Each structure stands twice: as structure tokens, then as C-alpha cells.
Amino acid sequence: MLFHVKMTVKLPVDMDPQQAERLKAEEKEMAQRLQREGSWRHLWRIAGHYANYSLFDLPSVEALHDTLTRLPLFPYMDIEIDGLCRHPSSIHADDR
């Protein structure tokens, strides 16, 4: 299943800077691993915001939930999710 996910990060203004940097490094490592594994298919930064649009390819809503809740920055995110399905006019073979 494909999911379009908008993640907006809202770190507390009083968070220890070292903790924030550690969380960001852990998040980057996990995001890159999930991309290499193929479950996090695309990742785009939203210009001017501490936010991203992502495309996840996972077997179920539960798998998406499990993946998102394991992200180190999850406690500091506002997340919006849209499930996607193949459009009948699409010419791309890798749509699912």
C-alpha cells in the first residue's frame, strides 16, 4: 500500500540542543535505512518549513503506524496521512 505522509516537526524551544542534535542524527539514520529497504520510497523537504512530504510503501496501515511511531522525532511531529491507490490513467508501471 502507498501512503502520502506529511510530517511537521515541532521541537520544544527549551529542548537541550545536544538532545535535539542526537534525535536528528538518529532520525536521519533510520530514514536512510528505510529508504534503502524500500519502504520509505520518497522524501521531500517542504521549502521554508521544518516539514516533509514522504511516500511510504508498506503492506498495511498497521505497518505504517508501527514505522512512524518508531521514528525518533515521532513525539514531536504533527502527521497527516493519505492512503493512495493507482490512478486508471497512470502510465507508470511502478504504481501500486
From Swiss-Prot:
Organism superkingdom: Bacteria
GO biological process: beta-ketoadipate pathway
Known EC number: 5.3.3.4
UniProt-recorded Gene Ontology molecular function terms: muconolactone delta-isomerase activity
Keywords tagged on the record: Aromatic hydrocarbons catabolism, Isomerase
Family membership: Belongs to the muconolactone Delta-isomerase family.
Assembly with partners or alone: Homodecamer.
Protein name: Muconolactone Delta-isomerase
